[in-house]
Amino acid sequence: MNYLCRMIAIEFPPPDFKIVQENGKTLIFDRFRKKYVVLTPEEWVRQNFLNYLVSTLGYPASLIGIEKEIYLGELRKRCDIVVYNRNMQPWMIVECKEMDVPLSQTTLEQIVRYHMVLPTAYLVITNGVNTFCCQHMVDAQQWEFIAQLPAHI
């Protein structure tokens, strides 16, 4: 992607996650889903990003949904993170990739397709190393990369 000038530098807070071993699998407690889930590389990025949204940026945990199911035609997909505004309208979609997966035009196209079904003001893609945020410019019907994550409204 040629948007490096708009890459957002994130300093994640120190992790304070509950991690356990069960039946040969490593599990992490997801405080949003209120259960232990398998700790995959993508889940590690998601949990750190969620922690950042709530602990650093002050996003209300009660307005964050995880793995929101949507349909693209007949295909069932899941948005990694959906942040809602105070009126419970979808406000931001976040797509998480594992740390060694580069963010690309394909990643951006994936989340834009999600936006067609679940319109939001912001789209975020992150792999925990690189993060990009786009704001939907409704009047111009285009996306603008912005230099920081917005304050929650």
Regions found by a protein language model. Give the residues of each.
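A short, conserved, highly charged catalytic patch centered on acidic carboxylates
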Residues: 2-122, 129-153
